[in-house]
């Protein structure tokens, strides 16, 4: 099984989304999943070609950090590229799990935006995670938060491995 992670944040050291996707990646690799990460901020000049990387994945994670408003320009560019250049047949068979952390507010709306976009593209959504984390060091002292993140990764693995069926959305 292969899962691609598309990270739309800025790559700052104190980005809580980085902590979450690192933890998710660790859990998935323990489950013998091949994980490939694409940092969109490093690949700005290649964003239009990135939808082709979905072809080799069984599932993807769209991860973003809300610092002010919305899921960020790089993630929007990636989703636009999926709409314009993506293989719609492959997208229709690909599960997506959103990860959205906020340092201000709006994490729920961000998760909803990613899920809605993926459904409009014809993809299969699966449960994700969102939360408000002002200081990522909170993860070091809270085993319950770590357990939530690990369960999300395990649930994504289970969903993809069992090829769970999704009810059809109205926005396709």
Segments from the language model and where they lie:
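N-terminal beta1-alpha1-beta2 submodule of the flavodoxin-like/Rossmannoid cofactor-binding fold
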Residues: 1-87, 146-172
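Short, glycine-/small-residue-rich phosphate/pyrophosphate-handling segment
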Residues: 92-144
């Amino acid at each position: 099984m292969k899962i691609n992670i598309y990270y739309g944040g800025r790559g700052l050291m104190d980005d809580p989304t980085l902590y979450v996707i690192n933890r998710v990646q660790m859990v998935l690799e323990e489950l013998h999943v091949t994980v490939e990460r694409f940092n969109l901020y490093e690949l700005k000049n290649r964003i239009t070609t990135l939808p082709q990387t979905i072809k080799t994945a069984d599932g993807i994670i769209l991860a973003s950090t809300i610092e002010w408003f919305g899921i960020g320009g790089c993630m929007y560019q990636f989703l636009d590229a999926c709409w314009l250049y993506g293989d719609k047949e492959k997208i229709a068979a690909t599960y997506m799990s959103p990860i959205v952390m906020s340092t201000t507010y709006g994490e729920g709306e961000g998760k909803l935006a990613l899920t809605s976009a993926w459904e409009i593209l014809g993809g299969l959504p699966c449960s994700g995670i969102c939360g408000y984390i002002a200081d990522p060091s909170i993860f070091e002292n809270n085993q319950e938060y770590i357990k939530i993140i690990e369960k999300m990764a395990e649930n994504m693995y289970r969903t993809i491995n069992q090829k769970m069926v999704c009810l059809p959305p109205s926005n396709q």
